[in-house]
């Protein structure tokens, strides 16, 4: 099947980076000085950035100044979503010490979901306003039959992303910074991790950086009150709306 061939080629392309990152995680101890767990977090993030940017070269998504579109075949999207959830589980297993510090929920699960939805609405509203201000075009809406698959993929993939940037990175930063400043720093670093995608992989430039900084800071603030569940919903639903062509 062409889909399986394409997926195999993608996995083969990211395997060298995976092996180097795995070797680093084996070499860097899980415990000891405070800076050591943070170094492990950056290794996880670096692998994520490499794997994400490789999706562009394999035609799995297209990023434009006014939106994004997942162009991978449905079977590949399903596989990538499942792999994202597998990476969530394996990362939690590898980082067992850091996992215990993660804020998974807010005070109440329902409130976490509500704040996650509010965060997504805020990200979408800010993105819509900026697009109107700078006259950026929107992509055409996708077929309704694709929406369930897009929603599932967006939530799964961005759950992994939020685990790295909020559950691990932001939570580690709380050892040195107040909650809001840690959210700001994690959001800015999140945007910075899209710089190569913005300037080299796609050459879209500033729109990607502006959107991802907004997205990262909002998700970071949501994490402070609603935990990883809320942050994942805010991020995942915003990406879903963008990929669906609704923004």
What is each model feature region?
Residues 1-98, 243, 247:
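N-terminal, membrane-interfacial amphipathic/helix-forming hydrophobic leader that caps
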Residues 4, 61-81, 86-158, 175:
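Juxtamembrane helix-loop-helix connectors linking adjacent transmembrane helices
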Residues 10-19, 23, 125-247:
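Transmembrane helix-loop-helix hairpins at the membrane interface
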Residues 36-51, 108-122, 180:
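Transmembrane alpha-helical segments of multi-pass membrane proteins
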